[in-house]
Curated annotation (Swiss-Prot):
Annotated catalysed reactions: NAD(+) + NADPH = NADH + NADP(+)
Main localization of the protein described in the UniProt heading: cytoplasm
UniProt cofactor note: Binds 1 FAD per subunit.
Compartments (UniProt record): Cytoplasm
Cofactor: FAD
A cellular component term, taken from the record's GO annotations: cytosol
Source organism per UniProt: Photobacterium profundum (strain SS9)
Keyword vocabulary terms for this entry: Cytoplasm, FAD, Flavoprotein, NAD, NADP, Oxidoreductase
Annotated GO MF terms: dihydrolipoyl dehydrogenase (NADH) activity; flavin adenine dinucleotide binding; NAD(P)+ transhydrogenase (Si-specific) activity
Root EC class: oxidoreductase
Protein name according to UniProt: Soluble pyridine nucleotide transhydrogenase
Length: 469
């Protein structure tokens, strides 16, 4: 039953309250527009806050602190150790999610942005129908629309996700038992992160990689470091494998691989790909057709093929990062209010991968520079040689700077180790400097606090410059 026969009208309607939707909403409301955000769940934040970035990183942080405690020589001498299960640390993750949700709700309230909870679908080019929790519906119209519905785990045919022992990267957060052995199918960013988390809790892990090496987009040395660290922690990595079938029993999962191998575990996490959340929007009513992955094509202003409909975030594909989605939302607000986005995503977007230890990189890899025949040199710093790492007990890891032999321009930075996603931003800031500002000499000529992890840049710079002749 539709409660309002005449649609409630807004200047702009944003579908989805994740980072992209939030960025667009804040920009548009601050510009004075009458804005509504439609969210299908019962609280704001989107997948990033509720099933993706925030809970998984909270889990990772809790596990890494347990590992750090148990490896600290002081506590080892006193025969003191911590043990926790996946279900126990889920409570910590939920606390963080609740804090994030309350904070983001406050953003909308303070900016007088209308929040509508329900599932939206187009009925014509300027009108959406919203299905409410009580199955009633309401109509809303707008001059402009922003689609920021995000993505969800890909569910291939042949995998029974209704089985109680089969999970995807969303449902794993509702894991109701504590497995002793888990199979993770898919060794991308999500699969590798969860492999680290479960192995850190002492769970036996089989990580099935459909490619020939882990995270092939990374610099080879960093990818190899992750492979070694997972192997050294006891994880079993199987590269170049694809599944033939997944067989479920009452208390286990049997994975059959096309190579003939098979393995049994308490449960399986399928983490191999994502698809855009566009299938329930009735986009044909507005004249749009998503691609096979549920994604929409946009121009430099994030406008789709329909000039009053924009899209941001995972639903448009690369780079599929929460940080980038928020920026895209801001740019859309500019495009709607002024006719053109006043900015664009930077050329070198940093990668942050929250394995244990972390991985982060920005710029070119060694294999890319070699293929392009760029005369580069390498500067390295091992964390085990840094006083701060020795004090903190985080000696596993390294920082690598790639720079041009002749101009000394920084071309790429790659970090493996605790706090890598934070450390990378120092180098990123220098890489973004114009002209002669981007030079490895900066790290030699500046004075760092001591002892700090930032000192790794000075050590790596000196190491690299000493290779020149």
């Amino acid at each position: 039953m539709t409660k309002n026969k005449k649609p409630t009208h807004f200047d702009a309607i944003i579908i989805g309250s994740g980072p992209g939707g939030e960025g667009a909403a804040m920009g548009l409301t601050k510009a004075g527009l009458n804005v509504a955000v439609i969210e299908r769940e019962n609280s704001v934040g989107g997948g990033c806050t509720h099933w993706g970035t925030i809970p998984s990183k909270a889990l990772r942080h809790a596990v890494s602190r347990i590992i750090e405690y148990n490896q600290n020589p002081l506590y080892c001498k006193n025969n003191s150790s911590l043990h926790s299960t996946f279900s126990q640390i889920l409570g910590h993750a939920q606390d963080v999610v609740n804090k994030q949700t309350r904070m983001r709700q406050g953003f909308y309230d303070r900016n007088k942005c209308s929040l509508i909870f329900g599932e939206a679908s187009f009925i014509d080019a300027h009108t959406v129908r919203v299905k409410n929790a009580d199955n009633s519906t309401d109509l809303y119209s707008a001059d402009k629309f922003v689609i920021a519905t995000g993505s969800r785990p890909y569910h291939p045919e042949g995998v029974d996700f209704d089985h109680s022992r089969v999970y995807d990267s969303d449902s794993i957060l509702q894991l109701e038992h504590d497995p002793r052995h888990i199979i993770i199918y898919g060794a991308g960013v999500i699969g590798s992160e969860y492999a680290s988390i479960f192995r850190g809790l002492g769970v036996k892990v089989d990580l099935i990689n459909t490619r020939h090496r882990l995270l092939e987009f990374l610099d080879n040395e960093i990818s190899d470091s992750l492979s070694y660290h997972l192997w050294n922690s006891g994880a079993m990595i199987r590269n170049g494998e694809t599944f033939e079938k997944i067989e479920g029993t009452d208390d286990s999962i049997i994975l059959h691989l096309e190579s003939g191998k098979k393995m049994r575990a308490d449960c399986l996490l399928y983490a191999n790909g994502r698809t855009g959340n566009t299938d329930k929007l009735n986009l044909n009513k507005v004249g749009l057709t998503p691609d096979s992955r549920g994604q929409l094509a946009v121009n430099q202003n994030y406008c789709t093929d329909v000039d009053h409909v924009y899209a941001v975030g995972d639903v448009i594909g690369y780079p599929s990062l929460a940080s980038a989605a928020y920026d895209q939302g801001r740019f859309v607000a500019q495009a709607i209010t002024t006719g053109e986005a006043q900015g664009s995503l930077i050329d070198h977007i940093p990668t942050g991968i929250y394995t244990i230890p972390e991985i982060s990189s920005v710029g070119k890899t060694e294999q890319q520079l070699t293929a392009d025949k760029v005369p580069y040199e390498v500067g390295r710093s091992q964390f085990k040689h840094l006083a701060r790492a020795q004090i903190a007990g985080t000696e596993v890891g390294s920082l690598k700077i790639l720079f041009h032999r002749e101009t000394k321009e920084i071309l790429g930075i790659h970090c493996f180790g605790e706090r890598a996603a934070e450390i990378i931003h120092i180098g990123q800031a220098i890489m973004e400097q114009k002209g002669d500002g981007n030079t490895i000499d900066y790290f030699v000529n500046t004075t760092f606090n001591y002892p700090t992890m930032a000192e790794a840049y000075r050590v790596a710079a000196l190491n690299g410059l000493n290779r020149l002749f």
